A protein has these predicted regions:
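ATP-dependent small-molecule kinase phosphotransfer cores
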Residues: 41-191
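Extreme N-terminus of proteins, especially the signal/transit-peptide cleavage junction
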Residues: 1-6, 51-52
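Switch II (G3) loop of P-loop NTPases
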Residues: 194-201
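Short coil/turn segments at beta-strand junctions that form active-site/ligand-binding loops
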Residues: 5-7, 190-193, 213
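Small-molecule kinase domains that catalyze NTP-dependent phosphoryl transfer to phosphate-bearing small molecules
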Residues: 3, 12-17, 24, 94, ...
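A conserved segment at the C-terminal end of the G1
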Residues: 21-33, 40
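Hydrophobic anchor at the beta1->P-loop junction of P-loop NTPases
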Residues: 9-11, 196
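Residue-level signature of catalytic and energy-coupling elements of molecular machines
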Residues: 145, 196, 245
């Protein structure tokens, strides 16, 4: 498709809002299968896995998911399955979340915190009376992704950890010689075309825009999401999306909105913040 001005398109939205679907639509609309093949047929035949589109899909969570697959002994295909992702892990993965002061700690499930084992935590604090309680956490693959990605990765190792490991692979495909009036001018760097459909935090938006990309928001009406983990709500009040797509109808209607964005929408709004 001609007229695409950006090499890098980020997509934000709650889970099940349609982020991946929009990413697949962008791939479809920039592939040789459009318009000769219908979009649903394109998905059914798994054509998005063929490197035919000018855009490829990358995720900030790709390498995080690889780590979780190693920990759980599962495949990426399993981890991408919605039912598998929400299924409780075996009991050996359960733990107690113990609240002390303004912090919380994870405690072995087999050592119930309301027994003498809790004294271990109390003895480590000058104010043991600040124990605020506990709750049983039955880990799921999704929760494990959140804990490793945000609570551990972003909050302990580095806030930009997943941006850094993702863009370490964002390297020029080649260089193009640019001439002016037939005379050599300079070498132009040609970067790969990426769609990143799991933008969750302001620093991820910043990382994309820093590299000349744009970020769109996908909203889905009538779909209640009670997940309040920071990875799901950190961008709820963000005001600098470059484009907003409301997924409030069926797939053909959504495809038309994505088509409008690709053809015309990139001139509607541009925020650099």
């Amino acid at each position: 498709m001609e007229g695409i001005k950006y090499n890098l398109i980020g997509i934000s939205g709650h889970k099940n809002s349609g982020k991946d679907l929009v990413a697949n639509m962008i791939q479809y609309l920039t592939s040789s299968y459009y318009p000769k093949m219908e979009f649903l047929q394109y998905l059914k035949e798994n054509k998005q896995s063929v490197t035919d589109s000018s855009f490829c899909i990358k995720r900030f969570a790709d390498k995080l998911k690889d780590i979780v697959c190693i920990l759980l002994g599962c495949t990426r295909e399993q981890l991408e399955d919605r039912d598998f992702k929400e299924k409780e892990l075996p009991e050996e993965w359960w733990c107690w979340k113990v609240y002390l002061d303004t912090k919380y700690y994870y405690h072995d499930y087999e050592l119930a915190p309301f027994t003498g084992e809790l004294d271990v935590y109390k003895q480590l604090h000058e104010s043991p009376e600040n124990f605020f309680g506990h709750e049983l956490v039955k880990l799921t693959p999704r929760l494990l992704l959140q804990l490793l990605g945000t609570d551990c990765g972003r909050n302990i190792i580095h806030p930009n950890i997943w941006c850094n490991v993702t863009f370490a692979d964002y390297k020029p495909r080649h260089f193009r010689t640019v001439k002016y009036n037939g005379i050599f001018s300079h070498q132009e760097m040609i970067l790969p075309n990426w769609i990143i459909p799991d933008v969750r935090f302001p620093n991820e938006v910043k990382a994309i825009k820093k590299r000349g990309g744009i970020v769109i928001r996908v909203n889905r009406s009538g779909f209640e999401d009670n997940d309040i983990h920071p990875s799901e709500v950190a961008l709820d009040n963000y005001q600098y999306f470059d484009y907003i797509i409301n997924n409030d109808s069926d797939i053909p209607a959504l495809l038309e909105k994505v088509k409008e964005f690709l053809y015309d929408g990139q001139d509607i709004k541009s925020n650099s913040k």
